């Protein structure tokens, strides 16, 4: 970003004194509403996630205050409903709110909607005479609507209402995603900003600047520049632009690959796998400790070593090592052949570019050890185990082993120390570098790896995507006391917790958000959308059922009959879930509007759904919450 753009951005969000734009106390004050389009017009939940990334970048450095900038975030059609709370005056709440929107899109999918309903919601909740959350007096007002809607008649039907918004002092900017401005010519707005689908993934600074300068920073007609005063600046730390190296294939490498611009996260947005929510995977938001252990014996060869360095460069270059950023990585590096040596300590680097620069320039990593064709991975893992003790407490740790040779006999056998490391709770990733004509013994190194974390390279392509996924698996876990969904050794972004006292369905419904308040605060009675998940939940509940505490192992689920719509719906708003597991004679709303899973007589873990009273039948609730991952941060003390 050039200096002028940075100054203009800072004007509204980190106020400074600039004569060419509004940098004064009064004009720095705004009431801003941002609408996130979560409808099926966005095509996929991945695009919604990228839309949220753009809004995150737009609002990243904003300093909110009740006397200056206030921000309201509206989720349109996320979870098939509208979410709009009062204006935020605490900047720390922005990311949490946006992440709840992301979770809703990823977990429940997209629902059809229209532009007219979005505008009507804004009128009823924020703009109209009976608005729940009205604006402040004598404050310039802005609405930024992100929209992928394409219905010309639907959009044109909002013209009179948006004209009313303008008359009330609201300047509306439409950020059209994947649509041309011609589609919106039939309505009324202050500014239209066009964003193509591919631009969502790169978040061009020019788009952010246009929204900021033309949609927020400008002075309304009739507002005059007041006496010049320097606005109070924020203490927010903004990360300086960095670069990284991107390599996908290395053949005949002789030096450091060319440096290219750091890719904008997310590198691999989360997406549902089957009936389950996958863990999110934004490499730049990883919060783990990593130790690379590299085989530099003769078997690795110079070409193999160059490939290993290129892969590490690509991975670390996309992470953050800056301790001033909440979600950052610590990295250490050890080399080994017949002996082991620490090359980089975790405390050596707080900048990923410095790490990758030294990765290529440090003389200890320039050549393989041609004097030794022996390997002692046991010593390498010993050094790695010692290094973990110097790293952060409570942070997930992983040891990544790159090996071209392997010895599982005598004192060189690394299997026992690897088992000890895994039992401590640390993960081990192995990458076997195999020459086509060489022995496959090195592929046996996979026996020391954590489940699903053993990989093989035939020295033709890097394994960046597989490695990113494995690192994100390390970064995916549940808050203390919650059970993670794990299928075939694959972790998913869903966590479960049974309430501890008998209570009504209604009481359990309100208890779940309370139990999750230290994490996302979006806990809810469990959503059951497949036979596989139903089986997992039934077994989990039985594993945690104690007859002395609960006579019958029955649990409430997040399903109920809505008297207004005369339909069964889930507490998360889903109405079109095809899966059900009713007991014989159910549902029966005469017995109640809420749903409890009850164990069948003489069965060990076979439950069926029963209609029960929402207030008078008592049982335990089974709560569901998002996992800690690259989207949802858990402090180390929560690990």
Swiss-Prot record:
Q: Where in the cell is it found?
A: Secreted
GO MF annotation list: carbohydrate binding
User: Which cysteine-cysteine pairs are annotated as disulfide bonds in the entry?
Assistant: 594-614
Question: Coiled-coil region(s) at which residues?
Answer: none
Matching InterPro entries:
C-type_lectin-like (IPR001304), C-type_lectin-like/link_sf (IPR016186), CTDL_fold (IPR016187), VWF_A (IPR002035), vWFA_dom_sf (IPR036465)
Keywords attached to this Swiss-Prot or TrEMBL record, sorted alphabetically, are: Disulfide bond, Lectin, Repeat, Secreted, Signal
User: A Pfam family in this protein?
Assistant: VWA
Origin superkingdom: Eukaryota
Domain named VWFA: residues: 31-178, 289-474
A GO cellular-component term linked to this record: extracellular region
All residue ranges annotated as the C-type lectin domain in the record: 491-618
Entry-linked SMART domains: CLECT (SM00034), VWA (SM00327)
Leader sequence segment:
1-19
Mind telling me what this protein is named? C-type lectin domain-containing protein 160
Q: Which gene encodes it?
A: clec-160
